[in-house]
Amino acid sequence: MKTSDNERIKYEITGQAVLQILRMKINFSLQTLIKQLLVMKSAEEDAFRRDLIDSIIRDFSNSDSGGPNRRTATADNKSMFNGKKINRIH
C-alpha cells in the first residue's frame, strides 16, 4: 500500500477516535486520544490497521515533548498552541 494511502487511513482512524471521544462528552486531551486509540486497537481484528493504530499512538506519544512532568488534561484551560485561555462551553 502507498504511503499516501497509509496516511489517509491513519487520518481516518484518528478522526474516528476523536469523534468517539466527542460522543462520550468527556474532556478532550492527548492522553484521552491515546487511550481511545488503545481501545480501538484492542477491538481491531485487522492486523494492518492494528499496526497503523500503533504507529498513530507512537506519533502522538513522541509529539508530547513534556517529558516526565507532563501536565494532566485538567491542569489548566490554556491552548497548547498559543497559551491563551480556552473558553469551555458546557
UniProtKB/Swiss-Prot annotation:
Region annotated Disordered, chain positions: 63-90
One biological process term in Gene Ontology: negative regulation of single-species biofilm formation
Coiled coil: none
Expression triggers: Induced by 5-fluorouracil. Strongly induced at 16 degrees Celsius. Expression is dependent on RpoS, repressed by YcgE. At 16 degrees Celsius with blue light irradiation, expression of this operon is absolutely dependent on YcgF for relief from YcgE repression. Part of the ycgZ-ymgA-ariR-ymgC operon.
Compositional bias segments (type: Polar residues): 63-80
Signal peptide: none
Function summary: Probably a connector protein for RcsB/C regulation of biofilm formation, providing additional signal input into the two-component signaling pathway. May serve to stimulate biofilm maturation, probably via the Rcs phosphorelay. Mild overexpression at 16 degrees Celsius increases the production of colanic acid, an exopolysaccharide and matrix component, and reduces adhesive curli fimbriae expression. Both of these effects require RcsB.
Protein name: Probable two-component-system connector protein YmgA
